[in-house]
Design a protein with these regions (language model features):
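Positively charged n-region of N-terminal signal peptides that target proteins for export
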Residues: 1-7
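Sec-dependent N-terminal signal peptides
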Residues: 7-15
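Low-complexity, acidic/polar, glycine-enriched regions of mature
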Residues: 21-193
Length: 193
């Protein structure tokens, strides 16, 4: 009987773990991408290769973006973005923070989805700006959930005092125009630990 009680206790603890665990971002399965527009009609999609993040038991979500990991497919452009726009030596990371109610997410059956509309903050180059995000949370299995943007989050260069840097980038690249509004999309996978 003692063995049966121990087995029951272990099973209950295993089932309860995701509801009380911290959730950690799976960088390999996650993606944060952005779209740049130049010369008024040429749009290109880029991404950041290194992300860190977690959602704690109270629902505080934090994603850290290593801005040095920007990847556009063109090394010279990557270097210009690192130096002129992100200023990675002074500001090596950007942060995204939000407060989630984890109860509905934890209650989802595998494969079930939940639309979320919530405020989040983006901190970039020492400035912080708030946005309203439309997200879709999907419970993948007992130990993983996914959050994707239903609509791109449009980041404006002016919100982070970056307009002069975008113009410097435009001049360095010999372009007639570079959009100061940048749509950002995300697919984030979190795993319970």
């Amino acid at each position: 009987m003692l063995t049966m009680n121990r087995l029951l206790l272990v099973l209950l603890a295993a089932v309860a773990l995701p509801a009380h665990a911290n959730w950690y971002l799976d960088n390999e399965s996650s993606r944060l991408s952005f779209t740049s527009t130049k010369n008024a009609d040429t749009a290109e999609v880029h991404r950041f290769l290194v992300l860190h993040g977690k959602v704690d038991a109270k629902g505080l979500a934090e994603v850290e973006v290593e801005t040095d990991s920007v990847s556009t497919g063109i090394p010279l452009r990557d270097e210009r973005l690192r130096e002129q726009v992100f200023q990675v030596r002074k500001f090596p990371t950007a942060q995204i923070n939000a407060q989630l109610d984890m109860r509905p997410i934890n209650d989802l059956a595998p494969g079930a989805q939940l639309e979320l509309r919530l405020p989040l903050t983006v901190s970039l180059r020492g400035k912080t700006h708030s946005y309203n995000a439309e997200l879709l949370a999907t419970r993948l299995d007992e130990r993983r959930f996914q959050v994707v943007t239903l609509e791109p989050l449009v980041i404006h260069a002016q919100d982070f005092d970056m307009a002069p840097d975008f113009n410097a980038l435009r001049n360095a690249a010999g372009l007639s125009a570079v959009s100061l509004s940048v749509p950002v999309g995300a697919v984030l996978i979190f795993t319970a630990r």
